[in-house]
Amino acid sequence: MLEKIGIMQGRLVPREIKSRIQSFPWTNWKKEIRLAKKYEIKYIEWTLDYKNFLSNPLIQKPLLVKKILKKNNIKLNSITADFFMQKPAWIKQKQKTNIFLIKLLNICNLLNIEFIVIPLVDNSSIKKGNKKKIINYFNLLKKNNHLKKTKILFEVDLPPKKVNSFIGYLDKSFGINYDTGNSAFFGYNFNDEKHYFKRVLNIHIKDRKKGGQTKTLGKGDVDFKLFIKYLLKIKYRNNLILQTYMPKNDNKVTYETLKNLNFIKKTIHEK
């Protein structure tokens, strides 16, 4: 059964940066954890930006974060490292990003956090011809024993066959974070994507039309019934994290997320 259903941080409280659909909720991160408990959401995926990275409570006071999560019965076993997308470590003069990632890996080891999601999209896209640099960078990270028990998962914008090729250069300390909405955006065939699903260890749930923006679940091109049926078939047991549409109207944010949560639970139940 698919039981590890959670939300990306910032999905129960108003956007603090109106121009961005995702950023760390500095003002309301504690409130959001309390709301997650109220609505019986068991998992939250933390998000870390490059700006003010060292001030983020997970970095500055990890044991306090652990205490607050435990008090509210919320599990944190995945983190999205948006800072890596914003300032890729393999680009010249981006040594801070490397330092940040190693610091984050140490905290993950301290708190027993399983996964760090590295978005290889936009500024950090493999399409920019950085494939060899990226592979060498992460293999060196593993060789220098920075990973320990934490696995690094890549969210990529490559066609399915190229995803298989890319992840094949890295061992089982690395995997794939699959994003339903991004797949729909690029118009990829899910049957082709199944070939690398043995390496998928975390899933971001969202809906989009081909070439379009994020929408309420069920309003885009993702066939969620087919998708959930496949996950049940392969006995997928890891996270399903809602990275769903965020309304600009602050009063509708929580309602939208709960509606999407009910949609995905209903789809699972119907199978």
Regions found by a protein language model. Give the residues of each.
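Conserved, mostly hydrophobic/aromatic
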Residues: 36, 44, 69, 108, ...
